[in-house]
C-alpha cells in the first residue's frame, strides 16, 4: 500500500515538474513566431488603415523603398507571380535584441483584391516552385485569403519575395468581376524601433529625459547597456535614463544636455516601404473579340489591296485599248 502511494506521489511530482519546466521554457525562450509580422496581426484587424498607410510603419519608422512587379492583366483562374523587391546593402549589419550585430531579416505583406488568393500547391508550376524555395506563407487572418504575409526571413536569401497568386473566376465566384484592381504591398528590412505597447527597442535613438548635467554614466554588467544619471538644472533632482545594449553613447560625464537631446547614435540601418500596382482581370471573350476585330481589319486591308490592283489592271487595259 505504502509503495503504491509513494509511486503515485512521485508520478504527480514528475508531472508538476514537467509542466513547470515547459512553462518556464515558454517564458524564457519566446518562440520565433512572436517576431513580426505577428505584432501587426495581434494588434490590427486590417493591415491597411483607412488613410492607405500600412500599419507596419507604426513600428518601422525609417522609410525605405519597396517595389512590386505584377502582370498588367491576367485571365480568370490563372496562377501568376507577384514579385516584391526589398533592396538593401547585404553587407551591412543591424543591432540584434541582445545588442550584438547580425544580418538583416526581411518581411512583406501583400494585400490582394477580394477573390485573389495564394495559389494552392497543386496549381503552382514546377518552375515557380523552384523559385519559391523554402518560403512559408500565411494569411493575415483566418478566412481572409487575399491578405498574405511572409517573414521574417534572411534578407541575403530573400531580398526578392515571390508570391504565387491565383486569380478568381467570375464564372464560379459571383463576388469577382472583370475590372481593374489595386494590389498593395508593404515590405521591411531590419528590426523595428517601437514595440506595439509603445516601448522602444534597442534599435533606435535614446534621448535625455531631462535638462541638466550628466552626473554619472554606469556600464551595466551582464547583458550590457548603460545607466545615465542627469542632475536636473531646475530643482537639483536626478533623472535616470537607461540605455539598453546596442546603441552607442555619444555623450560623456560632465556634459550638459537638454531634454530630448540624443544620448546615443541611431543604430537603425533598416526601414519600411509600401507601394501599389494595378491589375486587370481580363475577360477572355474580350480578347477573342479583339483578335476577331484585328483579323477583320487585316482581311479588309488585304481585300482593299487586291481591289486596288484589280482596278489598276482594268485602267491599264482600257488605256491599251
From Swiss-Prot:
Source taxon at top rank: Eukaryota
Keyword ATP-binding: no
Co-factor note (free text): Binds 1 heme group covalently.
Residue sites binding heme per the record: 36, 56, 59-60
Membrane-protein topology: Single-pass membrane protein
InterPro entries in UniProt: Cyt-f_TM (IPR024058), Cyt_f (IPR002325), Cyt_f_lg_dom (IPR024094), Cyt_f_lg_dom_sf (IPR036826), Rudment_hybrid_motif (IPR011054)
UniProt similarity note: Belongs to the cytochrome f family.
Subunit: The 4 large subunits of the cytochrome b6-f complex are cytochrome b6, subunit IV (17 kDa polypeptide, petD), cytochrome f and the Rieske protein, while the 4 small subunits are PetG, PetL, PetM and PetN. The complex functions as a dimer.
Function statement: Component of the cytochrome b6-f complex, which mediates electron transfer between photosystem II (PSII) and photosystem I (PSI), cyclic electron flow around PSI, and state transitions.
Name this polypeptide is given: Cytochrome f
Organism: Adiantum capillus-veneris (Maidenhair fern)
Gene name linked to the record: petA
Amino acid at each position: 500500500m505504502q509503495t503504491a502511494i509513494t509511486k503515485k506521489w512521485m508520478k504527480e511530482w514528475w508531472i508538476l515538474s514537467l509542466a513547470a519546466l515547459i512553462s518556464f521554457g515558454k517564458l524564457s525562450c519566446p518562440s520565433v513566431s512572436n517576431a513580426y509580422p505577428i505584432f501587426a496581426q495581434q494588434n490590427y484587424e486590417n493591415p491597411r488603415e483607412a488613410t492607405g498607410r500600412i500599419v507596419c510603419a507604426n513600428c518601422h519608422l525609417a522609410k525605405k523603398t519597396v517595389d512590386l512587379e505584377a502582370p498588367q492583366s491576367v485571365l480568370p483562374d490563372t496562377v501568376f507571380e507577384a514579385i516584391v523587391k526589398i533592396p538593401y546593402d547585404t553587407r551591412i549589419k543591424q543591432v540584434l535584441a541582445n545588442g550584438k550585430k547580425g544580418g538583416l531579416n526581411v518581411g512583406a505583406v501583400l494585400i490582394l483584391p477580394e477573390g485573389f488568393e495564394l495559389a494552392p500547391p497543386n496549381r503552382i508550376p514546377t518552375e515557380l516552385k523552384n523559385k519559391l524555395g523554402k518560403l512559408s506563407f500565411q494569411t493575415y487572418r483566418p478566412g481572409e485569403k487575399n491578405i498574405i504575409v511572409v517573414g521574417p526571413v534572411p534578407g541575403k536569401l530573400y531580398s526578392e519575395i515571390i508570391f504565387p497568386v491565383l486569380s478568381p473566376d467570375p464564372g464560379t465566384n459571383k463576388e469577382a468581376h472583370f475590372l481593374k484592381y489595386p494590389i498593395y504591398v508593404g515590405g521591411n528590412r531590419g528590426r523595428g524601433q517601437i514595440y506595439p505597447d509603445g516601448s522602444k527597442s534597442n534599435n533606435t535613438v535614446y534621448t535625455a529625459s531631462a535638462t541638466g548635467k550628466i552626473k554619472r554614466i554606469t556600464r551595466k554588467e551582464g547583458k550590457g547597456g548603460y545607466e545615465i544619471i542627469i542632475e536636473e538644472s531646475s530643482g537639483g533632482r536626478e533623472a535616470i535614463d537607461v540605455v539598453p545594449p546596442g546603441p552607442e553613447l555619444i555623450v560623456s560625464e560632465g556634459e550638459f544636455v537638454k531634454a530630448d537631446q540624443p544620448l546615443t547614435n541611431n543604430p537603425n540601418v533598416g526601414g519600411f516601404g509600401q507601394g501599389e500596382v494595378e491589375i486587370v482581370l481580363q475577360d477572355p471573350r474580350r480578347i477573342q473579340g479583339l483578335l476577331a476585330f484585328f483579323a477583320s481589319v487585316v482581311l479588309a486591308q488585304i481585300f482593299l489591296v487586291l481591289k486596288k490592283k484589280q482596278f489598276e489592271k482594268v485602267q491599264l487595259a482600257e488605256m491599251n485599248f
